[in-house]
Curated annotation (Swiss-Prot):
Tagged with keyword Phosphoprotein: yes
Species per Swiss-Prot/TrEMBL record: Mus musculus (Mouse)
Biased segments, Pro residues type: 31-48
In-chain residues carrying the UniProt-annotated modification Phosphothreonine: T71
Tissue: Expressed in macrophages and satellite cells.
Keyword Transferase on entry: no
Compositional bias annotation for Polar residues: 49-59
Cellular component annotations (GO), alphabetically ordered: nuclear membrane; nucleoplasm; nucleus
Protein's UniProt name: Akirin-1
Biological role stated in the UniProt entry: Molecular adapter that acts as a bridge between proteins, and which is involved skeletal muscle development. Functions as a signal transducer for MSTN during skeletal muscle regeneration and myogenesis. May regulate chemotaxis of both macrophages and myoblasts by reorganising actin cytoskeleton, leading to more efficient lamellipodia formation via a PI3 kinase dependent pathway. In contrast to AKIRIN2, not involved in nuclear import of proteasomes.
Phenotype reported upon loss of the gene: Mice grow normally and do not display gross developmental abnormalities. Embryonic fibroblasts obtained from null mutant mice do not express Akirin1.
Keywords: Nucleus, Phosphoprotein
Amino acid sequence: MACGATLKRPMEFEAALLSPGSPKRRRCAPLPGPTPGLRPPDAEPPPLQMQTPPASLQQPAPPGSERRLPTPEQIFQNIKQEYNRYQRWRHLEVVLSQSEACTSETQPSSSALTAPGSPGAFWMKKDQPTFTLRQVGIICERLLKDYEDKVREEYEQILSTKLAEQYESFVKFTHDQIMRRYGTRPTSYVS
């Protein structure tokens, strides 16, 4: 089987390589402005808003004409809208984190271990774990210790029962051996 690798040409060179009279069609250039795929992976996207694109982007270009690039004013407006959206998003993030901090400071520390269904747990977020990692470790240690104690008691009971059975069989075997060896002879102090 043959395997081949191909490289795509960058879009900026296509305009220079293809003349308007060329039989090949020109590839669409990407829209100017912010690209949605270039956000940092840990950042949450700002809330979606309905925006109307600029008038130059709404009208399709006739088939034979070149596509116009946005004017510096349109680029400035796009950047300004994106910056305002980013500021609102950051403001919401700060307000939410402050309200969470205030809520957790006003609650008593004893309610941190309440069950999720109890009335004292209404302030907890859904994503917040009920127990910390240390508390889970302590709970697991206690459960393992209790289970180990239970198994140990059960083992001791079974072992003592088996030992008692073995002792009884030993006594019976010894009694049978003595009776078989000496049979009907009377026992004496000197044997």
